[in-house]
Amino acid sequence: MADITDIKTILYTEKSLNLQEQGVVVIQTSPKMTKTGLKAVLKEYFGVTPKSINSLRMDGKIKRFRGRLGQRNNYKKFYVKLPEGVSLENTEA
């Protein structure tokens, strides 16, 4: 079962800020999170039922550290369309 601890952060990038005007919030989570799990977490902790959820899996970048190759963590990104007049910033978790 998905938990609130699986949500890493709400992303604030140029693209996500433009999407917020259309009622879409971009959420970064652990790779094991699913759409139904995220929907349950949003309903339980934020009291919000999303209109739609789109997801994509992001592979961690390959980086060099002290001459050796390493990899950043993989994560999932969700685009959550919220109902009119609802935002996650106004709710208390």
Swiss-Prot record:
GO cellular component, one term: ribonucleoprotein complex
Family label: Belongs to the universal ribosomal protein uL23 family.
Molecular function, one GO term: rRNA binding
HAMAP family: Ribosomal_uL23_B (MF_01369_B)
Protein's GO biological process: translation
InterPro entries linked to this entry: Nucleotide-bd_a/b_plait_sf, Ribosomal_uL23-like, Ribosomal_uL23/eL15/eS24_sf
Alphabetical list of SUPFAM superfamilies matching this protein: Ribosomal proteins S24e, L23 and L15e (SSF54189)
Subunit details: Part of the 50S ribosomal subunit. Contacts protein L29, and trigger factor when it is bound to the ribosome.
Keyword Amino-acid biosynthesis: no
Role played: One of the early assembly proteins it binds 23S rRNA. One of the proteins that surrounds the polypeptide exit tunnel on the outside of the ribosome. Forms the main docking site for trigger factor binding to the ribosome.
Annotated protein name in UniProt: Large ribosomal subunit protein uL23
Keywords, ordered alphabetically: Ribonucleoprotein, Ribosomal protein, RNA-binding, rRNA-binding
UniProt cross-references to NCBIfam families, sorted A to Z: PRK05738.2-2 (NF004362)
